[in-house]
């Protein structure tokens, strides 16, 4: 599904997008960026979904538990592995950043 949000780059693929976005909102995510093959519109049957998220205000343990729950729920919904992080090492970020897509939360 592709979104028509005016501030988003076209060409990304996020299976079950509306449901995934609701899971992220329910987990307290305030900002989410999709990166990797899904962000490039190159999703295959075996591709995972990669998210960089921000969850301001949550205590570290609570944030971790909310992320784990959201990750599990998205995996169950999409049938794909999900990688979710609150930060990336500088080298990985530099590689992923050009393809990142801001999701409309």
Language-model features: locations:
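Catalytic core of pol beta-like nucleotidyltransferases
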Residues: 1-31, 40-41, 56-105
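A short, glycine/Asx- and small/polar-enriched loop/turn
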Residues: 43-48
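Generic leucine side-chain signal with a strong bias for well-ordered alpha-helical environments
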Residues: 24, 49-52
């Amino acid at each position: 599904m592709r979104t028509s949000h005016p501030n988003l780059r076209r060409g990304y693929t996020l299976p079950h997008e509306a449901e995934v976005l609701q899971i992220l909102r329910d987990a307290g995510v305030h900002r989410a960026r999709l990166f990797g093959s899904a962000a490039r519109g190159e999703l295959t049957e075996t591709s995972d979904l990669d998210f960089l998220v921000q969850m301001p205000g949550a205590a570290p343990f609570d944030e971790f538990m909310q992320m784990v729950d959201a990750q599990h729920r998205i995996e169950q919904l999409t049938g794909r592995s999900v990688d979710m992080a609150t930060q990336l090492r500088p080298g990985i970020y530099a590689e992923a950043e050009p393809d990142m897509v801001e999701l409309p939360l």
